[in-house]
């Protein structure tokens, strides 16, 4: 690698490329003279589109090929949507930077209805996320929830073709792609608690690459990093993956972190909720203790059922 060149491994979806260009522009603004190249790749998650993520290995399908490129020194950094980043990293790799967060809420998107509550009974709602399905089913058990895979454009096309009455997407993705006008309503966390890290962009690199880590330091957003740290600590303690509905959302209000979380049965029949408030420096411990509260309040049984008896201790 030339000293003035930095290579970004990225997926080729429009949203992934937006994120990669966002990081590229930030790096070049912070380090004049730096040459930043994109290394576009196809991941298994981009190829397997006919099966729900939970059944084919979860969100890690979107990052594995990028991590291999880092380990083989074909790229220097990988740019991820934080909600797709697994809790564990391959040896030698790690998350070193979290950029400023976009709006983390879920978006209600429909051509005929202004809100979730306006949908008639029997309406078909599309989402690929068990977390969203679970919360939808709890609030509106009279709706028909169907799986929806593909990139943002594909999902919107399926809505426009009449396959769904409404779909649920991330506000952040729609805003970044210039599609904010498609949002009929942003769902508050009380209705749809976001995914861990939703709306944030994370950067992974080789942990022994001190030059790259120095270049990335300017892009780290302290408040976002604190919030995502609390959310991910909760998820790590739960050993959360794609197979179980887990939501976690931290806000920084008046110098204090407010962390909310839930674990649910996939059909929405049971949702265990909890929250914590505390000092920012305690973000990680807050996440762990909230996870333990959820486990003790019934989440352990939900996880055991989903994972065939193999629940966190």
UniProtKB/Swiss-Prot annotation:
Variant or mutagenesis effect after changing residue 11 to L: Loss of activity
Gene3D superfamilies registered for this protein in UniProt: Periplasmic binding protein-like II, Porphobilinogen deaminase, C-terminal domain
Role summary: Tetrapolymerization of the monopyrrole PBG into the hydroxymethylbilane pre-uroporphyrinogen in several discrete steps.
Lineage, opening ranks: Bacteria, Pseudomonadati, Pseudomonadota, Gammaproteobacteria, Enterobacterales
EC numbers: 2.5.1.61
Miscellaneous information on this protein: Arginine residues that are closely associated with one another might be involved in substrate binding. The porphobilinogen subunits are added to the dipyrromethane group.
Protein name in UniProt: Porphobilinogen deaminase
Ion transport recorded as keyword: no
Required cofactor(s): dipyrromethane
A GO CC term attached to the entry: cytoplasm
Alphabetical list of PANTHER family matching this protein: PORPHOBILINOGEN DEAMINASE
Pfam families in the cross-refs: Porphobil_deam (PF01379), Porphobil_deamC (PF03900)
Cofactor binding comment, as recorded: Binds 1 dipyrromethane group covalently.
Record keywords, A-Z: Porphyrin biosynthesis, Transferase
Single annotated GO MF: hydroxymethylbilane synthase activity
UniProt record similarity statement: Belongs to the HMBS family.
UniProt pathway: Porphyrin-containing compound metabolism; protoporphyrin-IX biosynthesis; coproporphyrinogen-III from 5-aminolevulinate: step 2/4
Domain of life: Bacteria
GO BP term (any one): heme biosynthetic process
Subunit structure: Monomer.
InterPro entries from the UniProt entry: HemC, Porphobilin_deaminase_cofac_BS, Porphobilin_deaminase_N, Porphobilinogen_deaminase_C, Porphobilinogen_deaminase_C_sf
Modified residues (S-(dipyrrolylmethanemethyl)cysteine): 242
